[in-house]
Structures are given as C-alpha cells and as structure tokens.
Amino acid sequence: MTLPLETIRLPHLPSALPVHIALYRDVNNSPFLRQQLLSGNADFEYAFIDASMVFSRSHILSAIFRAVNDHLNGRLKSRNVHSEIVFSLSPANNIADSFRKFGITDSTTDLLVVKVSVTPDVTHASVATHLQQYIEGSPVPFADETLSEISDISKIKKAYKLGTLGSRDDEKRRLELSLIGAIALRGAT
C-alpha cells in the first residue's frame, strides 16, 4: 500500500520548511514509539499526536503554523519544533499536560505524525521510508473526512473547556473556530 504522506508548504512560512504529515489507524506499537520520544532518540523526532484529539486539518495546521513560527522567531517553550506542535495544540501553558492530552500514549491507536524539514536531509522520501519502517498501523488519508471519523468531540471539548456551541448544523464550524482561536490566543500578552 502506498503511504499517504502529505507534504505541505504553509503560507507565510519559508518554503524551505515543508511539513510532512501522515495519519494512521489501528497502530499497535504506540508504546515503542512513545519510548523513542521519551528516550530522546533523534531518529524519532516527530510530533506524535493522538489523532482522536484533532478535529480537522485546519486545527492541526494552526498548531503547526504556531510552532514553526515560534521556532523561526526563537520563542520555543519546549525542546524542539516537534514537541512545540503538541504543546501548541493545548489551550493551557502546561507542557506536561499538553503531552498527556494531545500526545501519543501507550494506548493510542489513531496516530497523526508530523515532521518539519528543519534540515535539508529531511525529505518526503526519507520521512516516508522511516515511517513505513517503524509505524505498525494502517496509513489513511490526512483528510477532514477521515479525521471526523477519528475525532473524539467530547474529549476535545473537555480539553478546551467548551460547552454547547449552538445548533447541530452550526456546532462543527463553531467548534473549529473555537479551537483555532484557542491556539492563536494561548500565551498572547
């Protein structure tokens, strides 16, 4: 099966910093992947995100933009741009809490993987090969339709402390705008 790794160049950011994103279902080696992160294995410097906590492409792309922008401007609050992506998803300023709520856990089965090309040797091909070798799960398209099947709306609302957001038809759009607003406003002075 072809790996649906998507490479995105975000507007307003240097084209030399493309972002590689892949989405997986039925991942069965999350404990291994998490341990690689915890041990600081540089080969596994990715943002490993529990996909059930991602509402839409816009939601995660907003967090990525914020993290990469902070990276470029020397404002990282975490170890690297990849951990900053996970931290940027959180509406709070507690790094450990953001990893508990949004990062990979030993029980994660739906995984969103993000890699920023911070060095020239990080290419679409190198990321695709590495993920294919180490992620034991089924790659699926990184699309709003897929994310809507995976997203746990009640967990997301709880993490962002959001209640009812209006009529059923309007609720999804309001939720997405609330999530993006929370990412934009966190840490603003």
Curated annotation (Swiss-Prot):
GO terms for cellular component: chromosome, telomeric region; cytosol; EKC/KEOPS complex; nucleus. Keywords: Activator, Chromosome, Nucleus, Telomere, Transcription, Transcription regulation, tRNA processing. It is found in: Nucleus; Chromosome, Telomere. Its main location: nucleus. One of its GO terms (biological process) is tRNA threonylcarbamoyladenosine modification. Belongs to the CGI121/TPRKB family. Component of the EKC/KEOPS complex that is required for the formation of a threonylcarbamoyl group on adenosine at position 37 (t(6)A37) in tRNAs that read codons beginning with adenine. The complex is probably involved in the transfer of the threonylcarbamoyl moiety of threonylcarbamoyl-AMP (TC-AMP) to the N6 group of A37. Cgi121 acts as an allosteric effector that regulates the t(6)A activity of the complex. The EKC/KEOPS complex also promotes both telomere uncapping and telomere elongation. The complex is required for efficient recruitment of transcriptional coactivators. PANTHER family: CGI-121 FAMILY MEMBER, EKC_KEOPS COMPLEX SUBUNIT TPRKB. Component of the EKC/KEOPS complex composed of at least bud32, cgi121, gon7, kae1 and pcc1; the whole complex dimerizes. This is EKC/KEOPS complex subunit cgi121. The gene is cgi121.
